[in-house]
Amino acid sequence: MISVSKLSKQYGNQVVLKDVDLEFAKGQSVALIGPNGSGKTTLIKSILGLVVPDEGKIEVQGANIRTSPNYRRDIGYMPQLSRFPEQMQVRQLFSLIDDLRKGEDGIEKDLSLYEDFQIDRIARKALGALSGGMKQQVSAALAFYYNPEIIILDEPTAGLDPVSNEILKAKINRQISLGRLVVVTSHILSDLDEICNHVVYLMEGKIYMNASIDQIASETGEQKLNKMIVKLIENKNSDE
């Protein structure tokens, strides 16, 4: 569903991505992880067309993103920080999205998170008056709103209360069962244990690890993602 080939990006003298090759398939839920500054955000923004790479090619569902801008209709995106117009009401934001997508035929909206988070009760509130957790709920509901085939979630559980956290994780797992592609970044690796079946670990702009959770568990003998990562890094360092 997403193919990344020889992707490189540099800001001044800082190399952010270097010859990145990746393939993301239907039914995968990918944990995109790595230290701060490893290139995760730049990779996501490159896929979304928000950053123009210096070299390389990205295809989404077979379409080159440089020549097929409509590919983004198939992607639901939840940013790490949502910058909503502060004076706009929640209901107006959803209406605005509806207006922007008007004329697209055959799309059935997914209101499950809207309903599960009970967003109706805050629909007339100004976005600027919402708590951080409420903004995360709105952002998550928007990411799934138009039933996308690909969902990209950047730190999705940050700021969510425990109940909302479980609701969102259950939603992600339902999407995986439907064959959707989910890409998740998070520093809370314990959350990723429950929703991801594949790991891409970036370090200094390069792919350090690209494997299924089952494969990593078999290699390390560990069942928790954070322990798997530590064991693999220790093993690699001891081999060098």
Specify the residue positions occupied by each region the protein language model found.
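Catalytic Walker B motif of ABC-type/P-loop ATPase nucleotide-binding domains
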Residues: I151-E155
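Helix-to-loop junction immediately C-terminal to a conserved catalytic motif
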Residues: L48
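The feature captures the beta-strand-to-loop junction immediately N-terminal to the Walker
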Residues: I33-P35
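Conserved structural motif at the start of ABC-family nucleotide-binding domains
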Residues: I2, L17-D19
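Conserved ABC transporter NBD signature motif
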Residues: G56-Y71
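Conserved ABC ATPase "signature" region
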Residues: S95, D105-I122
